[in-house]
């Protein structure tokens, strides 16, 4: 636009030729406003889980999309690319990589304590290997994921329009178990982050039942039931102060150790066997760095390292030198390698759209509150459906009690509309009841079927 085409009018400039208007703003205020909008979008729509179902929008959309096309635990697998296309085209227009990566993580047994997706094919490894491309892998929902979607068709949760206003998607899932406590979550937002540990399902359910029985239950009583995090890679929690702090305040540092045992080889030499490693530790990277420490003489007493892990479980073998003392080598491994790592708990989740730091009791409270709302809505839906059915059955019973008159009226009518209007006028039926009578199959007129209708109505 040429400067000669612009007319200055107070706080804005008007383009005479194109009818455009350029508003003058303070750049500091504009940047502040734009940054707040961006940060809230990341916090609410991307990085933080909802306290009710423990899911971020992308995970929720993947599970809902799989449920909608019927990729259930008792059905055949479907190509991952098919699911990604479904979710991308209908609910999550932010690139196929984000959708596929989220789905892959939900299928990895070393990433989630209770995986929600069952994968077939190469979904990566604990060594940091990348999964195969989505065109090669296949997925379906696990049974536990289906428990998160039970009764979703019964108006149990609120829905919102998708990105192009063509479909509706759930704002939250009506999950039947506290997924946020059970599987944890992690995410980096703008100005805040969340890092929540997974826990044992049985303990969490027992803790939830204890809270339902006594809403004023003391934190110490809850902690006796939900004892500590339960990481998918196993391992040992070293020290309890960090765990207790995480339960009580929503923040804490949990120290994790790999499980090491001493064995004797067939040649009579001692060796250390690692059967589990801390959560979120890359096994191959840990072994490589340990080898570097041995070569640099920072760890003495180890002659060789072998990774004998297979589909039956993890097994990393450290062959010891003849003069090595196992306990000293174990302490060195914990001190210098990732066999001892920490997990910094920061329980930040969305409560009514706002980020909050939650302790153990808060997490259980918001889940129970959510389930109360879900069960209430389900009951209201089922009552409404039962009333609709009773209304139709009332009409059918009227027709069966006046069968000869109804048949005569229908036979005398020239069109379905005429028959429907005649039924409404003569028997005081509603349009819904009249339609049901006209749609009724002739077999309903038998004595047995008439008895069934009466019993169903009663």
Task: Describe these PLM feature segments.
Residues 1-3:
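Short, small-residue-biased leader/transition segments that mark boundaries at the very start
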Residues 8-250, 315-317:
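Catalytic phosphate-handling regions of large nucleic-acid enzymes and associated NTPases
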């Amino acid at each position: 636009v040429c400067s000669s085409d612009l007319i200055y009018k107070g706080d804005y400039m008007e383009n005479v030729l194109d009818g455009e208007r350029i508003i003058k703003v303070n750049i500091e205020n504009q940047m502040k406003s734009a940054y707040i909008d961006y940060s809230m979008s990341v916090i609410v729509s991307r990085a933080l889980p909802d306290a009710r179902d423990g899911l971020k929008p992308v995970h929720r959309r993947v599970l809902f999309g799989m449920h909608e096309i019927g990729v259930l635990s008792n059905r055949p697998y479907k190509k991952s690319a098919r699911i990604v296309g479904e979710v991308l085209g209908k609910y999550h227009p932010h690139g196929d990589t984000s959708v596929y990566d989220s789905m892959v993580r939900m299928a990895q047994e070393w990433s989630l304590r209770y995986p929600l997706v069952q994968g077939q094919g190469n979904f990566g490894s604990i060594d940091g290997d990348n999964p195969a491309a989505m065109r090669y892998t296949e997925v379906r929902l696990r049974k536990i994921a289906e428990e998160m979607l039970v009764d979703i068709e019964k108006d149990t949760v609120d829905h919102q329009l998708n990105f192009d206003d063509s479909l509706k998607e759930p704002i939250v899932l009506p999950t039947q178990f506290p997924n946020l406590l059970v599987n944890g979550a992690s995410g980096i937002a703008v100005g805040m982050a969340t890092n929540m540990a997974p826990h044992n399902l049985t303990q969490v359910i027992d803790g939830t039942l204890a809270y339902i029985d006594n809403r004023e239950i003391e934190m110490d009583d809850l902690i006796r039931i939900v004892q500590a995090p339960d990481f998918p890679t196993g391992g040992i929690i070293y020290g309890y102060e960090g765990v207790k702090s995480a339960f009580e305040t929503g923040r804490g540092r949990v120290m994790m150790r790999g499980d090491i045992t001493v064995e004797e080889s067939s040649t009579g030499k001692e060796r250390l066997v690692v059967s589990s490693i801390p959560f979120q530790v890359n096994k191959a990277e840990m072994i490589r760095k340990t080898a570097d420490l041995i070569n640099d003489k920072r760890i003495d007493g180890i002659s060789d390292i072998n990774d004998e892990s297979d589909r039956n479980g993890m097994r990393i073998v450290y062959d010891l030198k003849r003069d090595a003392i196992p306990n000293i080598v174990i302490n060195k491994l914990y001190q210098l390698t990732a066999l001892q790592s920490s997990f910094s708990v920061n329980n930040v989740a969305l409560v009514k759209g706002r980020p909050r730091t939650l302790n153990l009791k808060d997490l259980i409270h918001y889940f129970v509150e959510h389930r109360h709302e879900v069960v209430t809505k389900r009951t209201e839906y089922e009552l409404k459906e039962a009333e609709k059915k009773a209304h139709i059955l009332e009409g059918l019973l009227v027709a069966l009690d006046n069968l000869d008159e109804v048949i005569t009226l229908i036979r005398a009518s020239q069109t379905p509309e005429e028959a429907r209007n005649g039924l409404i006028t003569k028997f005081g039926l509603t349009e819904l009841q009249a339609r049901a009578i006209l749609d009724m199959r002739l077999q309903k007129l038998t004595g047995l079927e008439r008895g069934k209708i009466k019993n169903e109505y009663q």
